[in-house]
Amino acid sequence: MAIKIGITGGIGSGKSVVSRLLEIMGIPVYISDIEAKRITHTNDVIRRELCALVGQDVFLNGELNRPLLASYIFGSPEHAKKVNAVIHPQVKEDFRRWVKGKGDIAMVGMESAILLEAGFKQEVDFVVMVYAPLEVRVERAIRRDYSSRELIMKRIEAQMSDEVKRNHADFVIVNDDETPLIPQVLKFISLLSKNNHYLCSAKK
């Protein structure tokens, strides 16, 4: 059975960079954000339950009405919880099918900014947190998203703190533009490949 690696971190930490490195090394990575958007369009359970929650107009001509869904989600914290309760279980099921479809592969990854918040931690064996200092993250996100510092800070403040993520992580990768990244990834993979008993499973 494949070892499942959860990759998480805050906005601008560089999760996608680590995921790409793993894929280059032959370890496929399930990008939960992309896959969640896909199955929201295609999964009958999600479509039915979102229609029940938000109304039939949440899908127009077969396409997700994103402005309406966003308006519903941001209208109340309870609304966001209800939408997540519809989508997240289906993402978990999709991830399990995806892993099965990979056959006898040694390792797979799951990238998710909300790995811990969404309960995806229970789907993986080990959690890797990608860490970068706050200022580095803010500058990266501003450049990437063409956004303002104020908006980026609001998004960061809405996320789980780095301290909490670190407490749940089995391994922390520092991506601060100074510490070499590849040796850290290689070290982590080597530990899992040869001596995975040195790390505590995320499920324990």
Swiss-Prot record:
This is Dephospho-CoA kinase. Its EC number is 2.7.1.24. InterPro entries: Depp_CoAkinase (IPR001977), P-loop_NTPase (IPR027417). It is an enzyme of class 2 (transferase). Keywords: ATP-binding, Coenzyme A biosynthesis, Cytoplasm, Kinase, Nucleotide-binding, Transferase. GO terms for cellular component: cytoplasm. ATP binds at G12, S13, G14, K15, S16, V17. It comes from Bacteroides thetaiotaomicron (strain ATCC 29148 / DSM 2079 / JCM 5827 / CCUG 10774 / NCTC 10582 / VPI-5482 / E50). The keyword Cell inner membrane does not apply. GO terms for biological process: coenzyme A biosynthetic process. The keyword Flavoprotein does not apply.
